[in-house]
Regions:
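Active-site nucleotide-sugar/metal-binding loop of Leloir-type enzymes
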Residues: 1-6, 82
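Acidic donor-binding/catalytic loop of UDP-sugar-dependent glycosyltransferases
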Residues: 8-24
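Long helical/loop segments within the catalytic core of UDP-sugar-dependent glycosyltransferases
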Residues: 22-106, 148, 159
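Catalytic core of nucleotide-sugar-dependent glycosyltransferases
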Residues: 52-58, 142-164, 214, 248-253
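Catalytic donor-sugar/metal-binding loop of nucleotide-sugar-dependent glycosyltransferases
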Residues: 106, 111-133
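Nucleotide-sugar-dependent glycosyltransferase catalytic core
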Residues: 135-152, 231, 268
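Membrane-embedded multi-pass helical conduit in multi-pass membrane proteins
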Residues: 176-260
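Short, intrinsically disordered terminal tails adjacent to the first/last structured region
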Residues: 273-295
Length: 295
């Protein structure tokens, strides 16, 4: 097993975590174990919104039987023999990229490696005992650049892997996000239109449905304590956050369609941050022209 982590704090070495790693990693079908990531403490409203988001994601992973959507770069443990198979599959053209474990031109290398491992027939797991903490962005600018990389990287990974049994759930996930985006803006538009035309009415049915949404938002972040609840209860705060994330989706799709150059953005402790351009990720058919290294 090879550990891989880049987070501020990780708890994969605890007794419960080690036992969980061994239990889920022992079967031949398990290719890697990733941590269930939560947000680092500190920061203001932007940081707390991310912590709420990560708490809900951890809950979702647990409800899926500890099956990981993505092997988090914060802390993961990977089988050596599986990584060798990934590298060989890249060399043979069965996976995107050329010889190496990581596709170093992928914007989201951890997501890409997850797809690679699953494509070879292995499971990726995230046991609830393997809690890790990752940094949160402290301002909207840093969060925008981070999520642009995540969203665009995820879309480009799917474009390279194409539709398959492995990628189908990811395509469905992206489709649901896009449909949800249209539904939300339709709701906003109809609400504004009814208010302008004077036809706006409060109906008990929709109030009841809204109450269900409020309860869901509260229950899903209950473990986060009062700070999480203060953000979740009003709903409007997280509603604005959802609109922000939807703007990321729209811009990511636009950048891909227009062929805009992707950027790596590195937030720093100071006021300045570095941005560097990276080569556009290529499909597997172009892998011979790429210079990739195994990490």
């Amino acid at each position: 097993l090879i550990p891989r982590h880049d987070g501020v704090e990780h708890h994969l070495a605890g007794g419960d975590a080690v036992r969980a790693i061994v239990d889920v990693g022992r079967p031949p079908g398990a290719g890697a174990v990733g941590g269930v990531f939560l947000g680092d403490p500190g920061g203001g409203l932007v940081a707390q919104l991310q912590r709420n988001e990560y708490i809900r994601y951890a809950r979702e992973v647990a409800r899926r039987g500890a099956r990981a959507w993505v092997l988090t770069g914060t802390a993961s443990v990977l089988r050596v023999d599986v990584l060798r198979k990934v590298a060989n599959a890249r060399r043979d053209g069965a996976l995107p990229g050329s010889y190496g474990v990581y596709d170093t031109l992928a914007l989201t290398e951890d997501n890409e490696l997850t797809l690679a491992i699953k494509t070879l027939g292995y499971r990726t797991m995230s046991p609830k005992e393997c809690i890790v903490r990752t940094e949160v962005m402290l301002n909207w600018r840093d969060l925008w650049h981070q999520r642009m990389r995540w969203q665009r990287g995820a879309l480009e990974n799917l474009r390279h892997y194409k539709l398959s049994k492995v990628t189908r759930p990811y395509f469905v996930q992206q489709g649901i996000m896009i449909l949800g985006m249209f539904a939300m803006w339709l709701f906003i538009g109809l609400t504004v239109l009814s208010a302008v035309t004077g036809s706006f009415q409060i109906q008990l049915l929709w109030l009841a449905i809204g109450l269900i949404f409020v309860v869901e938002r509260i229950v899903t972040v209950w473990k986060g304590g009062y700070k999480s609840l203060v953000i979740a209860v009003p709903m409007v705060i997280e509603f604005v956050y959802d609109l922000f994330l939807q703007a990321v989706i729209i811009r990511s799709i636009f950048d891909i369609v227009s062929g805009r150059q992707a950027d790596w953005y590195h937030p720093t402790d100071g006021a300045n941050a570095a941005v560097e351009s990276v080569p556009q990720p290529s499909a597997s058919s172009e892998s011979q022209d790429r210079v990739l290294t195994a990490r």
